[in-house]
Amino acid sequence: MAPSFDFAASILLCAEDNTAILDLGEESEEISWVVGVDASLGDLSMDFPLQSDDCIEALLGREEQQHIPMEGYLQRLLLQPDGLDLVAVRSDAIDWIWKVHELYKFGPLTAVLSVNYLDRFLSVFDLPQEEACMTQLLAVASLSLAAKMEETVVPHPLDLQVCDAKYVFETRTIKRMELAVLNALKWRMQAVTACSFIDYYLHKFNDDDTPSTSALSRSVDLILSTCKVAEFLVFRPSEIAASVALVALEEHETSMFERVATCYKNLKKERVLRCYEMIQDKIIMRNIMRQSAGSVFSIPKSPIGVLDAAACISQQSEDTFVGSPATNYESSASSKRRRICR
């Protein structure tokens, strides 16, 4: 069982200098793995830097040691302690992140990092169940930190709290939560994610040719979608990236992958193929839903629709990937009625 939240809560109560909270200036800004991003999820157009073989091998060694949730995190989510559906709680938090991400047209890596921070924190600390607002506070802090890492223009913390947010937190409270996250993650914020590997595998599985824009767009869609489905937490970022590349390229032959996999002992072919099959299973599930539902409701044919449909089945809820910007702006009009949390 993870440690209690007492340590993080004590940080929330202490006073700190606002300039110490990840105040990144031009001289200290880290280079993003994703460059040239058109942040609209509906029309992704981006270039990922192609990593060298040596760089990929180094990333494979780093990802498990520093940048993924603690072992046993998924099992703890599925146990539902005291009847609390932690998978649904996590999904709700990610739903909200997706809505704000779309509203502000953040880049895809901002969304991926937000979920990475949220999961890594939850794998270390148990949030108090009696404080429903704590999960939302964590979601706000995770998104704020990710935006500071990746975006050139970062909204004020108060401006992030839109899109049907149930609580509104003061800026100082958000900054204290950010500090709690930073300490829990040991300030390792430039996380190794599936985005770190995707361009490399797209090239390798495409005979070292530059992948098409549609293949890259599908890959990003799938990476974003796998973030929400809790079952994919059992896989490492490199395994998800390799599987996503195979699906995006509609690659059914594994001979090329076998040649690549033999180069890196840290990349296990069996796990990649298992992840690949899980994604394909979600596609089959989507098709069954479309056939059985008929005209009652339709599920998008995109990868996002595929995995969101799977999440919908597993949670018995109609989850969506992103919220409508129009709805998001309308929801801000009622913000005065929401509780302000100090």
Curated annotation (Swiss-Prot):
Bias kind Polar residues: ranges: 322-334
Gene Ontology biological process terms, A to Z: cell division; G1/S transition of mitotic cell cycle
Chain spans, region Disordered: 322-342
Protein known as: Cyclin-D3-1
UniProt GO cellular component terms: cyclin-dependent protein kinase holoenzyme complex; cytoplasm; nucleus
Family as reported in the entry's similarity comment: Belongs to the cyclin family. Cyclin D subfamily.
Secretion signal span: none
PROSITE patterns, A to Z: CYCLINS (PS00292)
Highest taxon, organism lineage: Eukaryota
Gene: CYCD3-1
Keyword vocabulary terms for this entry: Cell cycle, Cell division, Cyclin
Entry annotated with the keyword Transmembrane: no
InterPro entries attached to this UniProt entry: Cyclin, Cyclin-like_dom, Cyclin-like_sf, Cyclin_C-dom, Cyclin_N, Cyclins_cyclin-box
Protein source organism: Oryza sativa subsp. japonica
Keyword Coiled coil: no
